[in-house]
């Protein structure tokens, strides 16, 4: 009821949540790190489950072999979500969701997203360089795709970033603040990276190898 009351008329509330993974045995429970979208009636109209999990933070790799526990509270591991599809929001372009450190990875797969939503908990970084590095990674995702990015961080840095990576507005670390701003428009044409993805790096690598071989064949006298 409290969450529903905070949804504006005709609007939506997007928030992070931990929920139980479905279809698990009673003796093998697991959790999902999720973003849920609530409408004014209190119904969940869209969701996304984090796909890239933090090793030793959200799950323990090779758990039976290493016999170590997570660095975070709780014994139950998280499991990755199954879909990377953008979430559909009434009155807005489809949104690609990146939860926490998913923002440090380039996109994988094609979709029809019109903007990027990055929801993160950076509190554990404290007043270090971590939040600033994490924020810079999110900026890079906007530039790669030519898409605006809205970043929501519980302790900052929360921001709206345009498709060129320029910061429209942002908050400071550990400061109470509210951002009220419009969503920048995505680039008309997809970027090279948006079209070709990680194959870009293969092309650049081959070009560099070719230039190096030519330089060896025709050294300067």
Protein language model features and the residues they cover:
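Enzyme catalytic cores with a strong preference for nitrogen-chemistry domains
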Residues: 1-221
